């Protein structure tokens, strides 16, 4: 009995001490690649649309989130980032939508509205956007409208300014 117990103990020790081969190496890189695009101008000549290439690989299982820097008219230096699309309804009944679409190679920012030609420069000139690419499985149940939540989720240290 003592010999059997010793054999089982030795066998268990050897079995748990074994090490298998290492698995394949994972991909290096950021958890959530991100960048900022400044001085975006929406003009009739560019059909109120601007394209920005990612400059990095985006996989079919990832989604792009885009945010616009919003002026809160408070006179304070508050950065307010709103998730696109964003809609503005003017007093005269006209409307404006800041929108975007994305592929695996680029993101397009564009304006939609009932009469874009009437918009002042404050709505079409020098707009600033932030883009974050995240795995689709990570955004389920996450408040993506809050850029700070997305920054924490993706462990984003800073946004590359383009």
Label for each model-derived stretch:
Residues 1-4:
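Positively charged n-region of N-terminal signal peptides that target proteins for export
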Residues 9-12:
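Hydrophobic helical h-region of N-terminal Sec-dependent signal peptides
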Residues 14-17:
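C-terminal motif of bacterial Sec signal peptides marking the signal peptidase cleavage site
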Residues 20-35:
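Collagen/collagen-like triple-helix recognition
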Residues 30-32, 45-51, 128:
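Intrinsic-disorder/low-complexity, polar/charged segments enriched in Ser/Thr/Lys/Arg/Asp/Glu/Gln
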Residues 32-43, 140-145:
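Disulfide-bonded cysteine-rich modules in secreted/extracellular proteins
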Residues 37-120:
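Extracellular attachment/recognition segments
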Residues 124-162:
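C-terminal partner/receptor-binding element of secreted or periplasmic proteins
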């Amino acid at each position: 009995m003592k010999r059997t117990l010793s054999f089982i103990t030795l066998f268990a020790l050897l079995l748990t001490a074994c090490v298998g081969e290492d698995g394949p190496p994972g991909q290096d890189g950021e958890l959530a690649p991100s960048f900022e695009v400044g001085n975006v101008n929406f003009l009739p000549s560019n059909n109120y649309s601007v394209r920005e290439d990612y400059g990095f690989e985006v996989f079919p299982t990832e989604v792009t989130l885009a945010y616009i820097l919003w002026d809160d008219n408070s006179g304070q230096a508050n950065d307010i980032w709103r998730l696109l699309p964003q809609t503005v309804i003017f007093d005269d009944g006209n409307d404006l939508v800041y929108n975007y679409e994305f592929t695996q190679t680029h993101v397009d920012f564009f304006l939609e509205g009932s009469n874009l030609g009437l918009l002042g420069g404050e709505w079409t000139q020098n707009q600033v956007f932030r883009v974050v690419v995240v795995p689709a499985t990570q955004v389920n149940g996450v408040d993506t409208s809050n850029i700070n939540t997305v920054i924490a989720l993706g462990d984003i240290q800073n946004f590359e300014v383009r």
